[in-house]
Amino acid sequence: LAAYQRKERAGLLIMATGTGKTRTAIALVDVLMKANVVQKALFLADRTSLVNQAHNAFKANLKDASFVNLLEDKNQVGRVYFSTYQTMMGLIDEMNADGTRKFGTGMFDLIIVDEAHRSVYQKFGEIFKYFDSLLVGLTATPRDEVDRDTYALFGLESGVPTDYYDLDQAI
C-alpha cells in the first residue's frame, strides 16, 4: 500500500513458500475495494490449478465480492476475475456484438500476477501493456534469483523488490 500511496503503479512482493501470498493478495484486493481504489481486479497465473486454488481461496475469504473464473465462464460479470495468461491473451482480442472489446483497456483497476518469477513476460507481456491498471507480482523465488526482466516489468531496480518476506521473518 505504501508503494501505491507514493503513486507507484506496480510492485513485486517476494514471499517465502507457505507465508501467504494468496492471503496477501486477498487482503490487498479487500482493502483497495473498500477504499474505492479498485472496482475490478484480475488474478493471473500460469497454470489452471493455481487459478482454481486462488479462485476458491478468494471465495472463502472475501465474502463481499463477486467472482468470475474465466476458465469456466467467459461471459459472467463480477468484481474479481481469475484466468491463465493463455486464456486472457485470447480474451483481450474478443469483441462484443456491438463491436466493442469484451475486455477494454480500463476493465481492471488491479492485476495480480501469481508466480511472477516465471518466464511469461516475453510470451504474455502484452497483457500487462494492454491493461491500464495497477500491477502487483507475487513470487516465492528468492530476490537474488529473480530475473532482472521481472524487476524491470514492475519498474524496479534489479534485486530490489517492492517488499519481501523471507522464511526467517516468517519463523
Where are these regions (language model features)?
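RecA-like P-loop NTPase motor core of helicase/translocase proteins
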Residues: L1-I171
